[in-house]
Amino acid sequence: QLDITPLCSEETMVACSPDSPYGDVVSPRDLDPASEIVVSWRKSVQDWRDHWFGLTTAPLLYADSMQVVNTFLGSEMMWAIVPAAAARALEKEGRAKICRLTDPPPERVSYLITRRGEALSDAAQLLLEDIRTEMRHIPGIQLFI
């Protein structure tokens, strides 16, 4: 048996080149899907993408890690849908400008999964506290525990 507890939720944002002409808030209608780097495989983001761009619209690139976004985001029109923590890390490194969406995909929820009836180890407690400390300072993240 497991206990599944929501840990946090994260807004989903657009990461684009620092030289991008996009403003602080962008409509999905203003995004060119041919310039998109798809890095999220969450069904809710895929459904959002299908809604705005159609089922047959191909992105520029499918990526399996944020490192790919970091590498390819140099062109002013390239963009990617990323969760808040990744967005802020890219922004802090000067690698991306972050834009909010007028109609974003659903927020990403992360969970703490533990064995029912077992207390967290001291190491796990420390890790959880470190996560809380780091995440409470990131705009776009809501902590639940």
Say what each PLM segment does:
Residues 110-113:
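A short beta-strand structural signal in non-transmembrane regions
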